[in-house]
């Protein structure tokens, strides 16, 4: 074979190998051809899988609003392609938000040193947060890690939102039972635009008539005012405001303090008890 012939054969084999590599590289994403994860714990999903996850988790969380894992999955499945990027861009457009994205802090019982928070001044953000956790019987260590958002930076944004959620509870004083969660989710929806926070409001149908009336007349109007008027909560560097007065922080964020749900329910129970006692006395 001539030099020219050998060169042609080599080039043909190289072209064939390159074509095979390109075909392999461009093979469409499917269940049988799942790309490698973009970060530890990441689970890439097809469009069909993402839709099924969103539908299944939405139905499951409506049936049982206490399933935090389903609510987390719903949040991730519905956050892309637009909403989580909008939230990430809101952080990039803010000096504090950019620092949070650069530092990547995590909120856990170890990083916050809960023992120290309980020694802070009574009305400080840190003490308020610790008292709220103790009262509600929850821990900052219970938040699931993000796994269904493809973009690594956006995955952190979702993780940050998830871990900051209890701070929102603490500064507003809202409890974790359904009535309090819905009030906070309404505020979060107007502040973050994450679909999951809006979809969570469908749990309204499971509330008792008195709770529905209370929500519509007291806490929904509060959530609308505070949600539309407040600053982007994702840009609060909570680790740096732990010693700040909580009333001062609410004023800076332009968030009103909502009616105390626990106190309202306590008063209603007392009224019902007195009414029952009066009825018993009347029957005797």
UniProtKB/Swiss-Prot annotation:
It is found in: Mitochondrion inner membrane. One of its GO terms (biological process) is ubiquinone biosynthetic process. GO terms for cellular component: extrinsic component of mitochondrial inner membrane. Keywords: Lyase, Membrane, Metal-binding, Mitochondrion, Mitochondrion inner membrane, Transit peptide, Ubiquinone biosynthesis, Zinc. Its cofactor is Zn(2+). InterPro entries: Coq4, Coq4_euk. It is an enzyme of class 4 (lyase). It catalyses: a 4-hydroxy-3-methoxy-5-(all-trans-polyprenyl)benzoate + H(+) = a 2-methoxy-6-(all-trans-polyprenyl)phenol + CO2. Residues 1-22 form a transit peptide. Component of a multi-subunit COQ enzyme complex, composed of at least coq3, coq4, coq5, coq6, coq7 and coq9. Belongs to the COQ4 family. This is Ubiquinone biosynthesis protein coq4, mitochondrial. It comes from Penicillium rubens (strain ATCC 28089 / DSM 1075 / NRRL 1951 / Wisconsin 54-1255) (Penicillium chrysogenum). The lineage of its organism: Eukaryota, Fungi, Dikarya, Ascomycota, Pezizomycotina.
